[in-house]
Amino acid sequence: MKQQSTKRFLWFRHNDSFFAAPLENLQEILNQLVLRPIPGADACLAGLTTIRDIVLPIFDPSAILKADASSKKSASYTIILAVEGVPRFGILADEIGKVMEFPPATALSQSARLAFAFGGEIETKHRKFVVLAPDNFARAMELSPVSAPQDSVLNAVSAS
């Protein structure tokens, strides 16, 4: 019998949804950050913050998942993810779980934007996790390739 390959993820919760982020893309987890909202921006962009003199966009995964503009735009934690070739970005989280190994995710049967931003879903005995695909997520959120670190983030956010 062929054994399924597994991948390590950090699970987290925001609002009433559970998510899993690949451990290989996790850069750091920060406590509450001050977010500067961007008037007229997409509802999934919770705001901008500055970390060590670099401006980062912070996204609300619940707003993307549920297309809900009324989603809570604050959280106890911000998970900073790094993907080669695009600026770092953050994801809001209310609860940080633990590192777990999961088999490959099954595809989401949702809108094209959702299916692209998220890498599918994984169901365990206790809950269902929406898997974040950071490289696809960065493209879905239109984060520009890195050339000038701060300019690329600001250009991507202003294009939203």
Task: Pin down the residues of each PLM region.
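An acidic, low-aromatic, low-complexity terminal/linker signal
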Residues: 1-160
